[in-house]
């Protein structure tokens, strides 16, 4: 499962074009970890991380930094080592270029950590910086598009936590429209659920239900049983109101 693909050299264009990504010896690991992060499955993420760090493969700076980023996530969520995780991410940002994908990933994760520990001013400053950075990126590149969607979803979620429901719904709806324009379902179901939850107090009941139903259909198509179960519970609660 974890056998790495054939090693390829860095293309010369990489040094002149920031949109080109180095061929990585962590290709399989990155694919698996991305899926586990989307599912918030930190147990399995730690398992594959432990396997990966035992390998004696050549790693680029960006690959090594990617593993440091994953370790910070594991430390924060698995071991409650919040200060250490935050410090690790802050150090990552000091040593890699803001043009790289891993910089954007680390900055987004650090922003989330700031939010979770109550450092709201730092979170909001980072969010503004992330939006500025993504405005310079080509969203035809899937990694940039998905990263931008993640940042905006996280911000909508943050607004809900601050009980700024109107702003949260507006942010989520704009991001849903972006998903549809770009013809991607990435984070679309969670965004629809967020609109349903945030709008429960002032949207029409049928409107809320329709957002849940649309999210449910996406979960069926893409086989996401955990999220599907949550949606079914939301619909049951809605029917009892």
Where are these regions (language model features)?
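Residue register of alpha-helical TPR repeats
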Residues: 27, 66, 105, 143-150, ...
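TPR repeat positional signature
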Residues: 29-32, 68, 107, 152, ...
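Structural motif corresponding to the intra-repeat A-B loop/turn of tetratricopeptide repeats
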Residues: 39, 78-79, 117, 162, ...
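Helix-turn-helix repeat elements of alpha-solenoid scaffolds
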Residues: 36-51, 76-91, 119-133, 163-173, ...
């Amino acid at each position: 499962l974890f056998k790495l693909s054939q090693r390829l050299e860095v293309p010369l264009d990489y040094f002149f074009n920031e949109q080109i990504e180095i061929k990585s010896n962590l290709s399989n690991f990155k694919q698996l970890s991305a899926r586990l992060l989307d599912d918030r499955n930190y147990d399995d993420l730690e398992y594959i991380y432990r396997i990966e760090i035992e390998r004696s493969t050549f790693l680029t700076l960006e690959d090594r930094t990617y593993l440091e980023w994953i370790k910070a996530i594991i430390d924060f969520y698995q071991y409650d080592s919040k200060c250490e995780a935050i410090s690790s991410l802050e150090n990552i940002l000091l040593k890699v270029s803001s043009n790289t994908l891993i910089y954007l990933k680390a900055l987004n994760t650090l922003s989330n950590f700031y939010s979770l520990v109550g450092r709201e001013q730092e979170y909001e400053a980072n969010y503004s910086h992330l939006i500025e950075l993504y405005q310079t990126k080509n969203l035809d590149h899937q990694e940039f598009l998905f990263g931008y969607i993640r940042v905006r979803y996280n911000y909508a979620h943050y607004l809900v936590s601050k009980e700024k429901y109107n702003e949260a719904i507006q942010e989520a709806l704009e991001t849903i429209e972006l998903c549809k324009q770009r013809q991607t379902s990435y984070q679309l179901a969670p965004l629809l659920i967020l609109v349903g939850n945030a709008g429960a107090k002032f949207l029409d009941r049928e409107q809320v239900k329709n957002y849940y139903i649309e999210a449910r259909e996406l979960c069926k198509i893409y086989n996401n049983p955990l999220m599907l179960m949550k949606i079914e519970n939301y619909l049951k609660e809605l029917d009892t109101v």
